[in-house]
Amino acid sequence: MDVNPTLLFLKVPAQNAISTTFPYTGDPPYSHGTGTGYTMDTVNRTHQYSEKGKWTTNTETGAPQLNPIDGPLPENHEPSGYAQTDCVLEAMAFLEESHPGIFENSCLETMEVVQQTRVDKLTQGRQTYDWTLNRNQPAATALANTIEVFRSNDLTANESGRLIDFLKDVMESMDKEEMEITTHFQRKRRIRDNMTKKMVTQRTIGKKKQRLNKKSYLIRALTLNTMTKDAERGKLKRRAIATPGMQIRGFVYFVETLARSICEKLEQSGLPVGGNEKKAKLANVVRKMMTNSQDTELSFTITGDNTKWNENQNPRMFLAMITYITRNQPDWFRNVLSIAPIMFSNKMARLGKGYMFESKSMKLRTQIPAEMLANIDLKYFNESTRKKIEKIRPLLIDGTASLSPGMMMGMFNMLSTVLGVSILNLGQKRYTKTTYWWDGLQSSDDFALIVNAPNHEGIQAGVDRFYRTCKLVGINMSKKKSYINRTGTFEFTSFFYRYGFVANFSMELPSFGVSGINESADMSIGVTVIKNNMINNDLGPATAQMALQLFIKDYRYTYRCHRGDTQIQTRRSFELKKLWEQTRSKAGLLVSDGGPNLYNIRNLHIPEVCLKWELMDEDYQGRLCNPLNPFVSHKEIESVNNAVVMPAHGPAKSMEYDAVATTHSWIPKRNRSILNTSQRGILEDEQMYQKCCNLFEKFFPSSSYRRPVGISSMVEAMVSRARIDARIDFESGRIKKEEFAEIMKICSTIEELRRQK
């Protein structure tokens, strides 16, 4: 019998069915090919929104720049980036008036952070534009390369290990007449293979020195590399995102630290909190508006959408905000914070890989790199691409486009939230001076606006005033995409509110299933996801039990570990059957060893090894948890690990799960194909970097880890630490005199070698 799906909804209130309309099952769409077109779209759109601004030329790089600040007031509803400085400053002043001391206190907190942050803060994050190689790299490698180049150019402040000192080097590097960098390149040769007698291509990796003059270096330092945003659901078109280089990152980090500190103190800010904490914060604002509007007032809520938030923001505006927020602070602090927006006002967008052409008839493919777009004949391109290139040409320098207005995605989320909240703050009656008033929530570009007034005309007037006030600071509320409802029903950052937040369970669908890390982690993550959804997302007991059974089934198929007494044949069944037969207590076998599943919704919080430990045969325990087992490259045993789970909205989030290290916690080896490419030198650097860091961690285990401050190098820190530890161990009798003498001798040798170097 076929089920008519509409019957499912007869008893379900509409708001609970919202999650079924979300595009969150199945694989998300990924982008293929280059992001060049999307980046050109972004650059062209951004300039279009600010087209009535003033054009100037950057004296250092020769880049043409458009400045829309204090431009004409809008005459229509088209999105525009003409923020008015005095309006922004006034909004800041009122925000401070409503929250006395907020800026002062946040500045003090940030100053402390600035003085304590180590440069390794910049190793967090994934792909980063590496200006030395002119392409993306893992953050740690990009930082190492930058520091290496700085040191070879006599910039050595960074050796203290403080981020602020590294930033001093960045500032100095911009004044240098030239910078010398080392680039990797590869040579290909055709040679005959001795064994097979076939011709093969041999690749060798070389390093060569290259000098960049001031202009070229500045362009690279100000460059944001662009990529296509992947796995974005519910969109027809892809869009470009940016990744800045190491010169910009440190400055951005400090600005965002200040803005985060301010956001934490603002009740309307949806950042930096998340999850249940965010829901509680939002519910408070709604409660406030509803209690005040009980009998006399109407209350309406707009589920807001802003048109092209980033592309209408302007770094010059952020500079004005920072100047105001830090106005009573010491000069060095104000200078450090103002550099990020200044660099963004002079930013260059790298256009990515360029275009790929193929000729069907001749079976030829050729890549047109972005550098060539400035002067290639446009007859090869289709109509829409031709228009894009024509428009962007005046802005091109060395394959990058000058992009002064606009912010690029995700750079100043916190600071732009402060700007948004400052407009929400103006809705208090003491500022509106009429019968209507508003409040709301802001989280980066997403907002919800609650307007109260005695009648419908008042509501309309309030919304209009909010809309116009936003226009004055470069925020464009979209009239097409925002909708208004009686307060009590709205959506904000994919949380649906209907007299309380409705669980939007479909959001979590992508994180169910087998992660593919290893047998041990996958089992743990799988049950933790189910447990967390029972706690946070209204996953009921029956559904959870079903999810668990599906997960175990999925897990067994993934790792081919069906129960030892099953009829299913896989490559592993022979071994698993043998194990099953020789095990006395079969309940003690892990699921990944063909054992039964003992999980139910009551014991999801217990790691499987612990759940079954008492049931295991002794020799099985010995094999399973044996750090000397030669077949396992062991991770050090940590009680809690972090997994990356993919919820449906927002970035991948980190989720803690209990980790018990067993022979199932293996780490897959790296794919060898990378070893034959030009990445090889980089890979070796990365491994060396990793080894040094691991060694350092051995000397300073996190429990006793007070970072050495003021010691000039890692080696010296480790040597002095080794001496102290050795003396303590010798005096307490833990090591013999000979061992103590040997350690001291090694330490002296290391110091001697450093002196000779």
UniProtKB/Swiss-Prot annotation:
Keywords, ordered alphabetically: Eukaryotic host gene expression shutoff by virus, Eukaryotic host transcription shutoff by virus, Host cytoplasm, Host gene expression shutoff by virus, Host nucleus, Host-virus interaction, Inhibition of host RNA polymerase II by virus, Nucleotide-binding, Nucleotidyltransferase, Phosphoprotein, RNA-directed RNA polymerase, Transferase, Viral RNA replication, Viral transcription
GO cellular component terms attached to this protein's record: host cell cytoplasm; host cell nucleus
GO biological process annotation, one example: symbiont-mediated suppression of host gene expression
Post-translational changes noted in the entry: Phosphorylated by host PRKCA.
Enzyme Commission designation: 2.7.7.48
Region called Disordered, residue ranges: 50-81
Free-text function comment from the UniProt entry: RNA-dependent RNA polymerase which is responsible for replication and transcription of virus RNA segments. The transcription of viral mRNAs occurs by a unique mechanism called cap-snatching. 5' methylated caps of cellular mRNAs are cleaved after 10-13 nucleotides by PA. In turn, these short capped RNAs are used as primers by PB1 for transcription of viral mRNAs. During virus replication, PB1 initiates RNA synthesis and copy vRNA into complementary RNA (cRNA) which in turn serves as a template for the production of more vRNAs.
HAMAP family referenced in this protein's UniProt entry, alphabetically: INFV_RDRP
Membership in a protein family: Belongs to the influenza viruses polymerase PB1 family.
Record protein name field: RNA-directed RNA polymerase catalytic subunit
Organism this protein belongs to: Influenza A virus (strain A/Chicken/Hong Kong/37.4/2002 H5N1 genotype X2)
Gene for this chain: PB1
